[in-house]
Design a protein with these regions (language model features):
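N-terminal Rossmann NAD(P)H-binding glycine-rich loop of SDR-like oxidoreductase domains
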Residues: 4-24
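Conserved Rossmann-fold NAD(P)-dependent oxidoreductase catalytic core, especially the SDR/UDP-sugar
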Residues: 70, 94-136
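Short alpha-helical oligomerization interface
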Residues: 77-92, 125-133
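Flexible, glycine-rich beta-alpha linker
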Residues: 117-118, 135-136, 160-177
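C-terminal substrate-binding subdomain of Rossmann-fold SDR/epimerase-dehydratase oxidoreductases
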Residues: 185-316
Length: 316
């Protein structure tokens, strides 16, 4: 049986990867530094702080995975862009990768970000669009990918780097835009938004997870964009939420200040579709429907968002 170690396994993307990996016959070892429900059939949970070198080394040498899906990072909405923890995660991740290779690891896939690209690039192509990150988060992810690239050339480790664009869906942080809008309308409250003219690439988190699993199983190497490939104006997303919930009048476009430069950023997904062989399950309307249903039945629409945070859509 193929053995995989998944970091960030209790996170937004990671939790969606676990059932997909189990369905494909993997022995799944999941890492979290938080207490989690360990009753997931077939998943072996490990409580580990990956920023601690001894704990990290012990985990990898104990599990001896053939595959590594590295999704863990500091990702508190609104804070992760310039957090010093970004540089800590670069160092910890590199050490994790080296230990993985030493114990006989064969294939490594890690999560990158669309924030590695130059801002407002429009359509982003893995080999053509300039990589000029403007945040510490984007710079740290890019630096890690460059180091991983060098390591793979020296040692022969097979790796791929999934550059995640904008995502939404079940278990989304309430401070992010789609979750904020859905929860506000389900409470019968206004969703106070900017003008919504941003042109972005939105992909349901289940599809993001399936893309990562498919990438892990492929022999495709280096950077691969993970997105829908279909840019959408944010106000159309918000209006779709209002339409499906039946409260379109509660979407308050232009009620809060907009950024001076309207963001335009989406993925070229030719490599993902043709080389990796992946296609999304959800279109936008279907993904929004599933998200609304999740918040209605499982989520907590009456809860409040993270104190001091403002709603927004973040690159992973």
């Amino acid at each position: 049986m193929k053995r995989v170690l998944v970091t960030g396994a209790n996170g937004f993307i990671g939790r969606q990867c676990l059932p997909l990996l189990l369905a494909r016959g993997y022995e799944v070892h999941a890492v979290s530094r938080q207490d989690v429900d360990q009753s997931s059939p077939g998943v072996v949970w490990h409580n580990c702080n990956l920023l601690e070198s001894e704990s990290r080394a012990h985990l990898v040498t104990q599990v001896k995975p053939e595959y590594l899906l590295h999704l863990a990072w500091y990702a508190v909405p609104g804070k992760f862009w310039e957090s010093p923890e970004n540089t800590e995660w670069v160092r910890a991740s590199l050490d994790l990768f080296r230990t993985f290779e030493k114990v006989g690891g064969k294939r490594l896939v890690a999560a990158g970000t669309c924030a590695e690209y130059v801002g407002n690039a429009g359509e982003c192509h893995e080999e053509k669009t300039p990589l000029l990150p403007s945040t510490l988060y984007g710079s740290s992810k890019h630096a890690l990918e460059r180091e991983l690239h060098s390591c793979s050339k020296r040692g022969g480790l097979s790796y791929a780097w999934g550059r995640v664009f904008h995502l939404y869906g079940a278990h989304e942080d309430p401070a992010r835009l789609v979750a904020y809008a859905v929860r506000s309308l389900l409470r019968g409250e206004q969703a106070v938004c900017s003008n919504g003219l941003q042109l972005l690439d939105l992909l349901h988190v289940v599809d993001v997870a399936s893309a990562f699993v498919r990438l892990l199983e492929s022999d495709v190497t280096e950077a691969v964009n993970i997105g829908s490939g279909n840019p959408v104006v944010v106000r159309e997303v918000l209006n779709e939420i209002g339409r499906q919930i039946g409260q379109p009048q509660l979407i308050r476009l232009g009620a809060k200040p907009s950024a001076p430069n309207t963001t335009r950023l989406w993925a070229n997904t030719v490599k993902l579709a043709k080389e990796v062989g992946w296609a999304p399950h959800y279109d936008l309307a279907g993904g929004i429907k599933q998200t609304i249903e999740w918040w209605r039945t499982i989520g907590d629409p009456k809860g409040s968002r993270t104190p001091g945070s403002e709603p927004g859509i973040d690159c992973r």
